[in-house]
């Protein structure tokens, strides 16, 4: 072959290579440009590993969407700073019972999801529990529940029966003491641990969460009195924890962890707490079967639990990638996504089709979840909670009725500016 033909051929080959390389580079660049990144802000840090797996599954099904998960310490404070500075993540795990969520929804920070088809994937229209001005801004995928943990093995040994009514609960405590056992493990230094029990007491006495808040939050200032029938019945229920001999030794100085360790080490046969406590109890490797029961009502079948949305998702109203953000939220409302979550977390799942462990210690509470016996925390309509926790523990330590009434009035009075 003549040299100029060789040069011509080499030139064609070289040009072809350059064109192919440029074409491939262009395709790669175009592919990269086509891929959309959305940010998911997570507050369930203990579930990071599981959520990463779920996100990978989503990305596999949606190769043009990349989900960047943000999970930081003190997530609530970080989120507040970002929202108030206008830097709202595309998809946010935010607790819909919190006042921040409600105020930010009213202020237009979140996308209105009212009427979206994926809301039908939730049990009993659960998203409606957290409507703000009759609009849905949150998709609550899981919830927590609260009740009474008990030593199932010891109950069987001693012939003790799980109470179905309040009177049976009182009788049970007396039977436990008669058998030289301690009824309750309590955390006197951390009032939030008794929040569930006290709220369940008030809901049970008044008949509903709305009625309880009507008495506490939406009544006239200084209207809570020791002579009130409601407060008297509430104190009867608090006294079941407060009466001498009903708690483990040194309970007044006990922390949350101390109370769970006391229960796990069989220093007490019961402890009031929420679903979040189960992993911590199991970490103590108790040598007995753990059980739970709902807060007993006045009649059989009236047991109740209280809790709220836990893994709950909102979308920024100003996201630049609404289509992709909604696609991710929709995916999270599927059983294939939430089955993986439930298998690790164990909390009640609002998504239809998730197979629940019928042998879970939480099953007696889980079966009430997302029904009319699963109330949302009363604090959904409060602007704070800490002083309520304090009023509860102060009463348990002193059994001072006037102190409880005064403490509740002092806590709720500043919120009542909107009460006619």
Swiss-Prot record:
- Describe what upregulates or represses it: By raffinose.
Mention any one GO cellular component term assigned to this protein in its UniProt record: plasma membrane
The UniProt function text for this chain reads: Involved in a binding protein-dependent transport system responsible for the uptake of melibiose, raffinose and isomaltotriose.
Major location category of this protein: membrane
Q: Where is the lipid attached (N-palmitoyl cysteine)?
A: 23
What are the record keywords, sorted? Cell membrane, Lipoprotein, Membrane, Palmitate, Signal, Sugar transport, Transport
The protein here is known as Multiple sugar-binding protein
The places in or outside the cell where this protein is found are:
Cell membrane
- Matching SUPFAM superfamilies: Periplasmic binding protein-like II
Q: Which InterPro entries match?
A: Bact_solute-bd_prot1, SBP, SBP_1_CS
One Pfam family this sequence matches: SBP_bac_1
Q: How does it sit in the membrane?
A: Lipid-anchor
Any GO BP annotation = transmembrane transport
Q: Which domain of life is it from?
A: Bacteria
Family named by the database record: Belongs to the bacterial solute-binding protein 1 family.
Q: Which organism is it from?
A: Streptococcus mutans serotype c (strain ATCC 700610 / UA159)
Q: Which gene encodes it?
A: msmE
- Covalent lipidation (S-diacylglycerol cysteine) residues? 23
Q: Does the keyword Membrane apply?
A: yes
Which N-terminal stretch is annotated as signal sequence? 1-22
């Amino acid at each position: 072959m003549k040299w100029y033909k060789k040069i011509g051929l080499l030139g064609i080959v070289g040009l072809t290579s350059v064109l192919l390389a440029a074409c491939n580079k262009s395709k790669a660049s175009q592919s990269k440009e086509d891929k959309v990144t959305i940010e998911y802000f997570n507050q369930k840090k203990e579930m990071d590993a599981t959520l990463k797996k779920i996100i990978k599954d989503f990305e596999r099904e949606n190769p043009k969407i990349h989900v960047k998960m943000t999970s930081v310490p003190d997530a609530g404070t970080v989120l507040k700073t970002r929202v108030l500075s206008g830097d709202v993540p595309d998809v946010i795990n935010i607790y819909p019972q919190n006042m921040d969520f409600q105020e930010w929804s009213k202020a237009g920070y979140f996308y209105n999801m009212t009427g979206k088809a994926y809301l039908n994937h939730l049990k009993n229209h659960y998203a409606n529990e957290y409507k703000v001005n009759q609009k849905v801004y949150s998709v609550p995928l899981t919830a927590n529940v609260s009740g009474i943990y008990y030593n199932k093995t010891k109950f069987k040994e001693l012939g003790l029966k799980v109470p179905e009514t309040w009177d049976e609960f009182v009788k049970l405590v007396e039977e436990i003491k008669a058998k030289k056992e301690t009824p309750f493990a309590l955390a006197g230094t951390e009032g939030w641990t008794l929040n569930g029990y006290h709220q369940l007491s008030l809901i049970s006495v008044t008949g509903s969460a709305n009625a309880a808040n009507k008495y506490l939050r939406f009544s006239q200032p200084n209207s809570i009195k020791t002579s009130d029938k409601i407060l008297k019945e509430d104190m009867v229920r608090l006294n079941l924890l407060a009466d001498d001999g009903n708690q483990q030794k040194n309970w007044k100085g006990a922390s949350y962890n101390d109370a769970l360790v006391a229960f796990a080490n069989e220093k007490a046969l019961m402890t009031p707490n929420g679903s979040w406590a189960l992993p911590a109890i199991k970490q103590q490797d108790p040598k007995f079967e753990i059980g739970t029961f709902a807060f007993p009502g006045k009649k059989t079948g009236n047991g109740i639990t209280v809790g709220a949305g836990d893994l709950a998702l909102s979308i920024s109203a100003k996201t630049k990638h609404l289509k992709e953000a909604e696609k991710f939220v929709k995916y999270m409302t599927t059983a294939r996504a939430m089955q993986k979550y439930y298998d690790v977390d164990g909390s009640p799942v609002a998504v239809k089709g998730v197979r629940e462990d019928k042998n879970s210690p939480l099953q007696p509470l889980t079966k009430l979840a997302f029904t009319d016996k699963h109330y949302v925390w009363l604090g959904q309509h409060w602007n704070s909670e800490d002083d309520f926790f304090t009023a509860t523990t102060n009463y348990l330590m002193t059994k001072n009725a006037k102190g409880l009434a005064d403490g509740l009035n002092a806590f709720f009075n500043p919120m009542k500016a909107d009460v006619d």
